[in-house]
Amino acid sequence: MLDPLVPTAVYKAPDFTEGQKFHPGEGPHTTNGKTTQISDIVIKAGGEDRDKPSDAKDTQLGQLRAKLTTLQDQLNIFLTKRMDHEKSRSQEEKDLERQVLDEGVDDDSD
């Protein structure tokens, strides 16, 4: 039987000619997301995840919940990589600007 409850997402931005599509895939799926847990720093300091979700029930809605967690992980990873790329690109532009200002413009028009 085909599962009718399969979430999908499409990320659109002006710099994307086509939207970035996300699909949870075949699994396995869990409600314990990779990107929605408390940070490793907090865990190492003895912190506890008090908001940890319950396991998904073996029902259509339970499986949908787990697939949504997978989809959320995919989106979070994609957006984090995108932000890191933008940050490094911005830093490269700042470095280039600083280099031009420090060295001046080479004007050979004399």
Curated annotation (Swiss-Prot):
Localization per record: Nucleus; Chromosome, Telomere
Domain of life: Eukaryota
Gene Ontology CC annotations of this record: chromosome, telomeric region; nucleus
InterPro entries per the UniProt record, alphabetical: EKC/KEOPS_Gon7
Single GO BP term: tRNA processing
Location of the region described as Disordered in the Swiss-Prot/TrEMBL record: 16-37, 82-110
Segment forming the signal sequence: none
Coiled coil (UniProt feature): none
Biased composition range(s): Basic and acidic residues: 82-101
Keywords: Activator, Chromosome, Nucleus, Telomere, Transcription, Transcription regulation, tRNA processing
Assembly mode: Component of the EKC/KEOPS complex composed of at least BUD32, CGI121, GON7, KAE1 and PCC1; the whole complex dimerizes.
Family, similarity comment: Belongs to the GON7 family.
Function: Component of the EKC/KEOPS complex that is required for the formation of a threonylcarbamoyl group on adenosine at position 37 (t(6)A37) in tRNAs that read codons beginning with adenine. The complex is probably involved in the transfer of the threonylcarbamoyl moiety of threonylcarbamoyl-AMP (TC-AMP) to the N6 group of A37. GON7 likely plays a supporting role to the catalytic subunit KAE1 in the complex. The EKC/KEOPS complex also promotes both telomere uncapping and telomere elongation. The complex is required for efficient recruitment of transcriptional coactivators.
Identification of the protein by name: EKC/KEOPS complex subunit GON7
Organism in which the protein naturally occurs: Debaryomyces hansenii (strain ATCC 36239 / CBS 767 / BCRC 21394 / JCM 1990 / NBRC 0083 / IGC 2968)
Gene: GON7
